[in-house]
């Protein structure tokens, strides 16, 4: 059972995964050992899936974001497996979501520049055919947050 302290721990770790356990314990009013047990349980139960380093996209030369809307035309199991494998194999495709509506998927690409989109486009087409694709260049990132709200658990 998740309580308010667990939610607070999850929020603190999302804000700073390197926060010392002693500081987390102090903020949630627990002993370090009790806090450590809670963090271990949250990991064990799958609430914490892992810890990653968030990189500065400009510093690693991936400042361009392009969203690609895709209509597949086919919805057979074999085609969808091929599609999922193809997009999973391209590291510049950082998110893929299946949609309702006029398009089947939206892909988020992290690229060094707009011109590099053509390279990715051709890579995708080598593996799967599409009915339609539309690309949209992000002009500005207004909000980006990997942190999820914890008040729903």
From Swiss-Prot:
Gene3D superfamilies: 3.30.70.920, Winged helix-like DNA-binding domain superfamily/Winged helix DNA-binding domain (1.10.10.10). GO terms for biological process: response to amino acid. One of its GO terms (cellular component) is cytosol. The keyword DNA-binding applies. Residues 21-40 bind DNA. GO terms for molecular function: sequence-specific DNA binding. Residues 2-63 form the HTH asnC-type domain. CDD domains: HTH_ARSR. InterPro entries: ArsR-like_HTH, AsnC-type_HTH_dom, Dimeric_a/b-barrel, Tscrpt_reg_AsnC-like, Tscrpt_reg_AsnC/Lrp_C, Tscrpt_reg_HTH_AsnC-type_CS, WH-like_DNA-bd_sf, WH_DNA-bd_sf. Transmembrane segments: none annotated. Keywords: DNA-binding, Transcription, Transcription regulation. SUPFAM superfamilies: Dimeric alpha+beta barrel, Winged helix' DNA-binding domain. This is HTH-type transcriptional regulator Zrp. It comes from Zymomonas mobilis subsp. mobilis (strain ATCC 10988 / DSM 424 / LMG 404 / NCIMB 8938 / NRRL B-806 / ZM1). The lineage of its organism: Bacteria, Pseudomonadati, Pseudomonadota, Alphaproteobacteria, Sphingomonadales. The gene is zrp.
């Amino acid at each position: 059972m998740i309580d308010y302290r667990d939610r607070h721990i999850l929020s603190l770790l999302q804000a700073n995964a390197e926060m010392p356990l002693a500081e987390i314990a102090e903020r949630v009013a627990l002993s370090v050992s009790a806090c450590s047990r809670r963090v271990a349980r949250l990991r064990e139960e799958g609430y914490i899936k892992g810890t990653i380093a968030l990189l500065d996209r400009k510093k690693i030369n991936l400042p361009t974001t392009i969203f690609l809307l895709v209509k597949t035309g086919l919805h057979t199991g074999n085609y969808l497996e091929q599609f999922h494998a193809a997009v999973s194999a391209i590291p510049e495709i950082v998110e893929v979501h299946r949609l309702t509506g006029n398009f089947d998927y939206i892909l988020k690409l992290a690229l060094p520049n707009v011109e590099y989109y053509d390279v990715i486009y051709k890579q995708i087409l080598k593996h799967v055919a599409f009915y339609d694709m539309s690309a949209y260049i992000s002009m500005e990132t207004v909000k980006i947050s990997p942190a999820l709200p914890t008040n729903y658990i």
